[in-house]
Curated annotation (Swiss-Prot):
Recorded coiled-coil stretches: none
EC number(s) per entry: 2.5.1.7
Sequence positions that bind UDP-N-acetyl-alpha-D-glucosamine: 102, 131-135, 172-175, 317, 339
Species per Swiss-Prot/TrEMBL record: Agrobacterium fabrum (strain C58 / ATCC 33970) (Agrobacterium tumefaciens (strain C58))
Function per UniProt: Cell wall formation. Adds enolpyruvyl to UDP-N-acetylglucosamine.
Designated name of the protein: UDP-N-acetylglucosamine 1-carboxyvinyltransferase
Gene Ontology biological process terms in this record: cell division; cell wall organization; peptidoglycan biosynthetic process; regulation of cell shape; UDP-N-acetylgalactosamine biosynthetic process
Database matches in NCBIfam families: murA (TIGR01072), PRK09369.1 (NF006873)
Lineage of the organism: Bacteria, Pseudomonadati, Pseudomonadota, Alphaproteobacteria, Hyphomicrobiales
HAMAP family (alphabetical): MurA
Length: 430
């Protein structure tokens, strides 16, 4: 099993190319089930979750071809992937596939919309709290679907003639459920109005792609989205937006290690809140012609309190990385997690490196220390795993991160990108 070895102490200087967003690519790929034409996606990252979803879509009858190019040694792959689903050959998404990745559950929306039925296993993915599927079920029921849970599967069927547009208010904001409702409502009869919809850039990206396919959608990026159903969707060509979580992660890595790095192919508007928070911590961030420049030279890291919130608030997917940064701040900071109820699993691993963190419910208190010391640590989920890498960049000696398959789910060749900027990071196999 692979591990990541980090030898701390080096600053980061250079250019890091930002990949396409995993959290945008997955729903875009699933949208290929909505049309019998070809959907072409550019800037698709090469990640374990993407490859798993390719297998799942193939199970449903999607023909997939990949074109990749590598412009120079070490540069991230820029992949163009073509998805063609002439006929859906199977409306069942089996446990052995869906259990490995939560987002694969989202196929339930397009399958219902196009075929009128779906049998989908309850999902897997990161072990972050309960993450129930109630919001998905209730949203699709509002469109007329009949839903039944049986033996770990959801059996869903649309009314005769297809799903029916409706006005629905989510009881809480959910990115995944908003994705599913967008896709399902695009082929529903009549008009659907979604209130309390997620406003994340990935939702907007999906809406833009669906519109290019012929959907009629207004309001994406606001809390109210209106979808006028159409009888069919066509193919389209769409570029996956830059990964804002990867952008924020590398910005925090530079903040931790110090240095001067250009994050290429991204933009500040995707994560204004997180970047403003880093500025408060003492990091200089500016726009460039190709992306963002992140600089921290000499000045110490200032403590900053954060509360995770849906977009445009501070992203929960950057909480662990920011906690790692705060372990070296010149004071005490507090992090309140409001999105997931069990997203502090990285705390005990950061403590193994010398971090001083105490928990009280959904709040963490971080007392900055002057030094961290390398140790063997274990990744518990995707974002927690990269927080350990960030901490390892400044820890004295060697930090060995195990269970890095979590990293491979969401970060495209992380060790290579960091190494190109001067970090001592390598993947080792037992």
């Amino acid at each position: 099993m692979d591990r990541i070895r980090i030898t701390g102490g080096n600053k980061l200087n250079g250019v890091i190319p930002i990949s396409g967003a995993k959290n945008a690519a997955l729903p875009l790929m699933i949208a290929s089930l909505l049309t019998s034409d070809t959907l072409t996606l550019e800037n698709v990252p090469h990640l374990a979750d993407v490859e798993q979803l390719i297998r799942i879509l193939g199970n449903h009858g999607v023909d997939i071809s990949v074109n990749g190019r590598r412009e120079s040694q070490g540069e991230a792959y820029s992949r163009t992937v073509h998805f063609t689903c002439r006929t859906i050959v199977d409306t069942t998404a089996p446990y052995e596939l869906v259990s490995k990745m939560r987002a694969s559950f989202w196929v339930i929306g397009p399958l219902l919309a196009r075929e009128g039925r779906a049998r989908v296993s309850l999902p897997g993915g990161c072990a972050i709290g309960t993450r129930p599927v109630d919001l998905f079920i209730e949203g699709l029921q509002a469109l007329g679907a009949t839903m039944e849970i049986d033996g770990g599967y959801i059996n869903a069927s649309a009314p005769k003639g297809g799903l029916i547009g409706a006005v629905y208010t989510f009881p809480k904001v959910s990115v995944g459920a908003t994705h599913v409702m967008l896709m399902a409502a695009s082929l529903a009869r009549g008009t659907t109005v979604i209130h309390n919809a997620a406003r994340e850039p990935e939702v907007v990206d999906l809406a833009h792609c669906l519109i290019a396919m012929g959907a009629k959608i207004e309001g994406a990026g606001t809390s109210t989205i209106t979808i006028e159903g159409v009888t069919s969707l066509s193919g389209a060509r769409h570029r996956v937006l830059p990964d804002r979580i990867e952008t924020g992660t590398y910005a925090m890595a530079v903040a931790m290690a110090g240095g001067d790095v250009v994050l290429e192919g991204t933009r500040a508007s995707l994560l204004d809140n997180a970047l403003d928070t880093l500025r408060l911590a003492g990091v200089t961030i500016s726009d460039t012609d190709t992306g963002l420049r992140v600089v921290r030279n000499g000045n110490g890291i200032q403590p900053v309190d954060i509360v995770t919130e849906p977009f445009p608030g501070f992203p929960t997917d950057l909480q662990a990385q920011f906690m790692a940064l705060m372990t070296r701040s010149q004071g005490v900071s507090h992090i309140t997690e409001t999105i997931f109820e069990n997203r502090f699993m990285h705390v005990q691993e950061l403590a193994r490196l010398g971090a001083k963190i105490s928990l009280s419910g959904q709040m963490a208190r971080i007392e900055g220390v002057t030094r961290l010391k390398g140790a063997p640590v274990m990744a518990t989920d995707l974002r927690a795993s990269v927080s350990l890498v960030i901490a390892g960049l400044v820890a004295e000696g060697e930090t060995m991160v195990s269970r890095v398959y979590h990293l491979d789910r969401g970060f495209e060749r992380l060790e290579e990108k960091l190494t190109r900027c001067g970090a001592l990071v390598e993947r080792v196999s037992d």
